[in-house]
């Protein structure tokens, strides 16, 4: 038959099985495609491995170390976000070593976080939710100062409060790899590291399009919309009267938006 008349190429069942891996995660058998990570396998099975620097569609950097898990036969913990799931692998996500590692990581991050603002009963964001989940003391030794400063002081739409930034770099990677704008970057190193907006701190000069991608991916709310967040923190933001599906007018892609309508 001519090439355009041929049907789809059928794969032998053995070829399909070779492209799959069967792993055991917390006692549950999971079949995953070759090349997928432990995190992919776990999420596909509904098993929650905590993450902070990892985010869907972003390049994996594995720098927060919150997703480390125990793998049978390995002497050290492995990052679930960056470790390929191989056939026969046995993974424990909440082993004593993994949990203690998460508590240690969260404690270190709390050293540069305003712990007195964390609610006693629940977290306001992803990071605080993990602090509660692993029952980490909400205290600071005071050895390191809080990060300070609004990186967008003249921005009428977005506030970037460094005091709650944990340097996960989600915002930097989202701006660079999803929006392909590259407005944000990490400046300096060590305890002096911070996220900056362009060379002079002016988002307009840096080419910001105010798409809101950095707001969406931030796990602590360090980057947030000005008006809604102020009301949310004050407890005065009412539930939306309705939600309207619309289309973003910025470019020709036609991304759909869900707009929350408050007070008419």
Language-model segments: which ranges?
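Fe-S ferredoxin-like electron-transfer domains
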Residues: 65, 74-210, 215-216, 220-247, ...
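N-terminal cofactor/phosphate-binding cores enriched in small/glycine residues
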Residues: 30-87, 101
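Conserved catalytic-core segments of large NTP-driven translation/proteostasis enzymes
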Residues: 245-255
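Generic start-of-chain signal for non-secretory N-termini
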Residues: 11-35, 227-230
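Short beta-strand elements
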Residues: 69, 257-261
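Short strand-turn-strand beta-turns centered on an Asx-Gly dipeptide
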Residues: 25-28, 72-73, 262
């Amino acid at each position: 038959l001519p090439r355009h008349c041929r049907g789809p190429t059928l794969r032998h069942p053995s070829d399909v099985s070779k492209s799959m891996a069967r792993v055991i995660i917390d006692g549950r058998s999971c079949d995953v495609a070759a090349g997928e990570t432990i995190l992919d396998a776990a999420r596909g099975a509904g098993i929650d491995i905590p993450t902070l620097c990892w985010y869907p569609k972003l390049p994996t950097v594995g720098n927060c170390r919150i997703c480390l898990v125990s793998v049978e036969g390995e002497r050290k913990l492995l990052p679930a976000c960056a470790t390929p799931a191989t056939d026969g692998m046995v993974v424990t996500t909440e082993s004593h070593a993994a949990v203690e590692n998460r508590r240690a990581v969260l404690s270190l991050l709390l050293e540069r976080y305003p712990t007195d603002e964390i609610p006693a009963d629940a977290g306001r964001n992803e990071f605080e939710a993990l602090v509660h989940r692993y029952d980490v003391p909400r205290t600071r030794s005071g050895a390191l100062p809080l990060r300070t400063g609004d990186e967008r002081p003249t921005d009428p739409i977005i506030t970037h409060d460094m005091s709650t930034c944990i340097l996960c770099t989600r915002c930097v990677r989202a701006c660079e790899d999803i929006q392909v704008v590259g407005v944000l970057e990490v400046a300096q190193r060590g305890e002096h590291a911070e996220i900056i907006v362009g060379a002079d701190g002016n988002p307009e000069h840096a080419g910001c399009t105010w798409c809101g991608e950095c707001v969406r991916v931030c796990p602590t709310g360090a980057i947030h919309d000005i008006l809604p967040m102020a009301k949310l923190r004050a407890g005065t933001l009412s539930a939306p009267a309705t939600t309207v599906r619309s289309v973003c007018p910025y470019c020709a892609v036609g991304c759909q938006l869900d707009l929350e309508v408050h007070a008419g």
